[in-house]
């Protein structure tokens, strides 16, 4: 057995501290490192903190671990591969205050948008993970045919369209302002939370594969790892994203499927020309057919993130095995060059061609709450394309649920897994 315990320093420090320990008999928890003595030094031995194991190193699991550890719990974060290695590292990072209004996620989204703003102030998010308010525009683009490609040269600039968007864009409409829309770099955001929790709140990070949750007398007691390692727990949080269904404890209760989404990251030569305007496109291919709905997110890093081309697909066991479909990447590159001359080949470097799986439920509502019939075992998954937005409020709510017995930041009734029980309404 090889267990890798990783501690993450402050994001401004370029090197990670990675310690590899090999021992066939001892459990991973005995090798984990507490990087802050500030919490442990004041801990009352007669009133030990609640031991919580959070399974899943994506944004939902990390936000949950962050708020739990900040709230005084002794938290172990278990991740199979690496922090933010899946959708949380490859998402767009777009945040919206009111785009979920009128739906089941409205209160969660509003609370989380405001919590993102607070976290950015607390963690210096503008510098550490690219938090910033942005404008959002809806645009229509009809892909030019070869015979009409010269029309782009004669395009009259629209004052309502950012100057760098010099392709055949039409029908601009403002759908978000700096008061209602914002962005983060999701990978940097997730890593920043882990760093803060490790350094100041005693979070332990263990790299290992979850095999099962041991249940005794109707309560979760131990997290069992592949290879035989065990971590004792007073509570367990399962934030497994699209891998939720692979755990029999949850797969028998409800379905979470994976929507495979593709993205590319470009770095234009003239990055300063790109303004902080998120673009939501109705894109009509030259060959006809159903219009596409790609999204374009300029980042303060100087990069431009473009995503789209989503379809349900089988989720592989290993997140590192998720590979993009070449045709989907080709389409996104075509979209890029029709959006802006700054994004054509030769004017922009391709930094990433990637794919990830968004966790979706059959009723399009996240699953957040205690697992029916298993006291002390909680689930948080199924956030689809709004995982980065709703991560903070989900994490804060689950933390309250675990430590206090109920959540005050948002009413979790609508998200409870009990809705999947036969006869529930």
Regions flagged by a language model, labelled:
Residues 122-208, 212-219, 224:
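Flavin (FAD/FMN) cofactor-binding and adjacent substrate-gating region
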Residues 184-274:
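Predominantly flavin-linked oxidoreductase catalytic cores and closely associated redox partners
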Residues 67-70, 74, 80-136, 142-153:
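Conserved FAD-binding subdomain of flavin-dependent enzymes
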Residues 138-143, 259, 326-408, 412-425:
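Flavin (FAD/FMN) cofactor-binding core of flavoprotein oxidoreductases
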Residues 66-67, 93-95, 127-133, 235, ...:
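Active-site substrate-recognition segment that forms the wall
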Residues 47-76:
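N-terminal Rossmann-like FAD-binding beta1-loop-alpha1 element of flavoenzymes
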Residues 1-27:
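N-terminal chloroplast transit peptides
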